[in-house]
Swiss-Prot record:
It catalyses: RNA(n) + a ribonucleoside 5'-triphosphate = RNA(n+1) + diphosphate. Its cofactor is Mg(2+); Zn(2+). It comes from Acinetobacter baumannii (strain SDF). Pfam families: RNA_pol_Rpb1_1, RNA_pol_Rpb1_2, RNA_pol_Rpb1_3, RNA_pol_Rpb1_4, RNA_pol_Rpb1_5. DNA-dependent RNA polymerase catalyzes the transcription of DNA into RNA using the four ribonucleoside triphosphates as substrates. It is an enzyme of class 2 (transferase). Zn(2+) 1 binds at C75, C77, C90, C93. This is DNA-directed RNA polymerase subunit beta'. Belongs to the RNA polymerase beta' chain family. GO terms for biological process: DNA-templated transcription. GO terms for molecular function: DNA binding; DNA-directed RNA polymerase activity; magnesium ion binding; zinc ion binding. The lineage of its organism: Bacteria, Pseudomonadati, Pseudomonadota, Gammaproteobacteria, Moraxellales. Binds 1 Mg(2+) ion per subunit.
Amino acid sequence: MKDLLDIMRKKTDSDGHAPVEFDRIRIGLASPEMIKSWSHGEVKKPETINYRTFKPERDGLFCAKIFGPVKDYECLCGKYKRMKYKGVICEKCGVEVTTAKVRRERMGHIELASPVAHIWFLKSLPSRIGLLLDMTLRDIERVLYFESYVVTDPGMTPFEKYQLLNDEEYFTALEEHGDEFVAKMGAEAVQDLLKDIDLEAEISRLREEIPQTTSETKLKKASKRLKLMEAFKDSNNKPEWMVMNVLPVLPPDLRPLVPLEGGRFATSDLNDLYRRVINRNNRLKRLLDLAAPDIIVRNEKRMLQESVDALLDNGRRGRAITGSNKRPLKSLADMIKGKQGRFRQNLLGKRVDYSGRSVITVGPTLRLHQCGLPKKMALELFKPFIFAKLQASGQATTIKAAKKMVERETPEVWDVLASVIRQHPVMLNRAPTLHRLGLQAFEPILIEGKAIRLHPLVCAAFNADFDGDQMAVHVPLTLEAQLEARALMMSTNNILSPANGEPIIVPSQDVVLGLYYITRDAVNAKGEGMVFADTHEVNRALATGQVAIHARVKVRVHQTVINENGEREQQTIIVDTTPGRCLLWEVVPEGLSFDMINLEMTKKNISKLINSCYRKLGLKDTVIFADQLMYLGFRQATRSGVSVGMEDMLIPPTKHTIIDKAETEVREIEQQFEQGFVTAGERYNKVVDIWARTNDQVAKAMMDNLSYTLVKNKQGEDEKQKSFNSIYMMSDSGARGSAAQIRQLAGMRGLMAKPDGSIIETPIKANFREGLTVLQYFISTHGARKGLADTALKTANSGYLTRRLVDVAQDLVITEPDCGTRGGLVMTPFIQGGDVIEPLRDRVLGRVTAEDVRRASDDEVVLPRGTLIDEKIAAQLEEAGVDEVKVRSVIACESTFGVCAKCYGRDLARGHLVNPGESVGVMAAQSIGEPGTQLTMRTFHVGGAASRTSAANSVQVRNKGTVRFHNVKTVQHAKGHLVSVSRSGEIGIADELGRERERYKLPYGASILLKDGELVEAGGIVATWDPHTHPLVTEVAGKARFSQIADGVTATSKTDDATGMTTVEILPVTARPASGKDLRPAIVLDTTDGGEQFYFLPQNTIVTVRDGETIGVGDVIGRVPQESSRTRDITGGLPRVADLFEARKPKEHAILAEVSGIVSFGKETKGKNRLVITPDDGSEIYEELIPKWRQINVFEGEHVNRGETISDGPQNPHDILRLKGEVALTNYIVNEVQDVYRLQGVKINDKHIEVIVRQMLRKVDIIDGGDTSFIKGEQVDYIRVVQENQAVLAQNKFPAKFERQLMGITKASLSTDSFISAASFQETTRVLTEAAVTGKEDDLRGLKENVVVGRLIPAGTGLAYHLERRRQEAEAAEHALHNDFSEVDQAFSQALNSEQF
């Protein structure tokens, strides 16, 4: 404690000490001697201060003699006052004359009358004392709290060491053996036992024992003990120090006692806890002096132990000690842990001076790098600068005079303020700061009023709106801080989003609407067909009203474009355009072509425009352009006069016919259900499906009706043109509102979800314009309420996810240019169904190639290895028809600390290769966490309307191409078509270049109409299936024979009265009578060649064949109805992302084949099937027990590959890692996380997810230590193992064998090397206990640790400082070594010279 204090002393120390330079911090156990060396005296009395004089009592908890004077340079009795007596110790009161702040650092101690065990090492699991002594926690507690004796030295008696005796047994033994043996109780006994441990001997014994143990539990326990003992041995901690004889006392100013008015005192809880300890300790001393009866002394010792426990960690054992107001007292442990504890409240987050906050309003006239700062605030924030300036300019003689002037607000003060503020950036921050763009620098402009003015374009980055949001202003004081604020944090330098590299400074809402409005064209507007010489002429015509803003005209345009070689060339062209687009052209910078703006400026197009402006023309032009766009957009939106009226919500005339048709269909299904053709689940599914489809049809009719109007053109004919309906324009431009919202206004509200997520099958057929009935309104309140409740809960969850992500990735920084690895990920376009969701160019953009990229057709190298792929190269790759590229990835990076620039690739927020020192870990965490919060805050906007697509029932291709099968197994049906019998099959469609354009999942039992490699036209149907049932398909022909299908036992048969048809349905195991519980209903096919094939029927199967019927290949013998699907909302999303990053095993996860081989089924056990795989390579047979209710996808005799799915379900990431490797795991996690975000339309670069996955894969499990220093079963850093293995292999020894370990982010954060980082994250007590016992050293490599010790962080501009320090140390070490050598040389030469040969 005291040592830490010495370390933390800063340069200007009161006692003139030089600051201690340190590289690492070690934590350990304090010996009694050490505690005494910290102390300035013993606290003997429980008194605090005298209630009359308010002076501290002597030898009490606030004693001035021990802890130092209460007032600066003044002893307690007042004999010595002032500086001149500094260092004098008053002979009357014994107080040293010095500053009062020593009361914050001087410690005291309490000599305990009997030893006391430290509760952390006793109760924090696993109990360290218990592990060392190999006793159970229960037993140790019984000894400690004086319930039983423990034998510490058995002597020649039959007792064993560590044996427990109760009172009776002890007294009997005493009579029998006298003092031949020693048994004690209490902490003394434990201390003696700990002292007796011979670590060396125990370690060697355990090392011999471990290889011989066979039992798993014994092995685990032994290796745990071995680790702990080696830690004690290596760290120079002694086990007996876990029991304390001396208790340190915290300096009094850290546990203050403050007098309140009315003679009461407010005190820190620690004082109460210390008082308790001192009282009991003094009483115990007295009792021992009086030689009181044993039972009384014992009770007192127990109470002392309890009071020390409460002081260290109240509530850890038994009931927490409460104060006067029934509130548990806050102990030392509570002071450091939790959100309000020392770490998170004071070390990682501090309050900042020179800051203010106010409400924000919009500042449409500002430039992008400016913000409006109220004069009042500026005056307060820049006070010291103003004082200095007033003094320097001679307007004020002293600081005091300057202060007066500022208070009076004289006119010259405002002039000074204006000059001080010029070029001095301030930082604006909006809470919650979810990513780094939540804190940006601006140049302040002084304004009247009291609200901060914010530039509208940065609102997206801050996620700010002007409905009462507040923002904080911070002033960077030092020159370096101002420089960094300007160069790195200025809003103009943060145009791209770090999450996806797209512009984040993109106009929205009014601006988009304005730009969209002026760039629309209209048929037969005034002035159509006119020709203009240039844009100025267009302007004049517009101003005089000769031409309408939407008219189609011809204009001669001068444009400057940048050609292939990067040179600018002038062009003059005549274009068909509108006057509005010419207005826009006037603000477009030189270098962009006219065709980029000669279209309707929707939000997407504007974003593209700004993006290409940034890529082609650089930062400065883009910033100016963005501002001009904004001014133009606001102006034109005002002039457009777009507003919303009831008349704008056009209800499609065909709505009622569509709904009537749907109602007929629903009635038909109801009839089928009544006749027993469909099950209740199927009926529900089909009804919901019909309504989902109807909703889409109404929406489509509505959009068609809304989006086009018929107008007469110049020739007087009818022509369709896009509508100028206000609501449609808002939605079409991307300014506000979506098709889904308009659908609720003018189409039908559609299906609603219940609070549990299931869909109510009666939809709301009305829309908001028609109005809802009471019932409809009531149904829709479900969704709305769920939305609000979700929002409240999810915001907290999302914040917590971000915190965990930041914590796991905080120490990942770019540390070197290139690690030289050849590994990486193979990138392919991401195709789902008929859509290329993410083309290859987007996936490889900003990555570095890991190996030469070759053209598929002629194997020519298109791109050499190690190239950074930019937009131009990405486009070339597409043209060359490249289908996959292997790129470098952080997953494969081999840097020891952090990652290398080549593996990371482009810094998304800056658009070039990432700089050294960039903290990519935190960036990744923020990029993933930030949208999480956004999404959770936005759940309720669709009003809980169930967005469920109608189920797919066929593969219909969109492009002409060749059919490709991807691991599809098929059988040929008698009718000629193929039937799919594979589970994970996919069908791809490749174009003429061989690039895949579409990809579809193929369910089991689908009928495939084309063969592999056949041509298919656009719109052709390749496969069909029934989406609501899961068929059982035969793979051989033969005669069906029912096995164990007994009516009323394992099955039930229903006869339909209307048709006389009988169907057999298999009962679920739970619904069967006892006799049918263990039966396995199956259909056995007696094949033509005399064999038999078993088809086991899962529960609820509806059998579609009769006993004895002849069956062909590919026939359906039964179908299993599929259950309904729930609505997917980001509510499913956020917990899903958390589950993925926590690497949780899903419930009922997919079962994968552990080895490749032939499947067979062994003897069943109760409730489980035994699956046997006979491996191809002849190794031992693999068996697995699978619960009977699981549907098994493979049949007897089928061949499976390692990692293939045996039983469907959600994938278990641990299985993927074990069976398919880390690349497959990375792809799985990246795709799954991306699915959740993609569903919400959020773009995140894959890189960020990979960064987190790298951190989750940090550790490995050692399977066999080989010749390395690792023990079997140990968890070690992957990089460490790889390095040690290389070293061992170089000496021709055996390397360690290991298995990569996947850890959830919480666990990974806690298993970091830095104990400071782990302790400040979660489970502070556990982390610190473990670190202290093992004597851990923190090398202060991460960001968090350095923030805690108050240093620059080793990232960004702080990295240089750390590298320089390391360099100097290395130099000093080398220098010392060099000196040693020269001394040796000298000695040698002297010796040689003096020798007389």
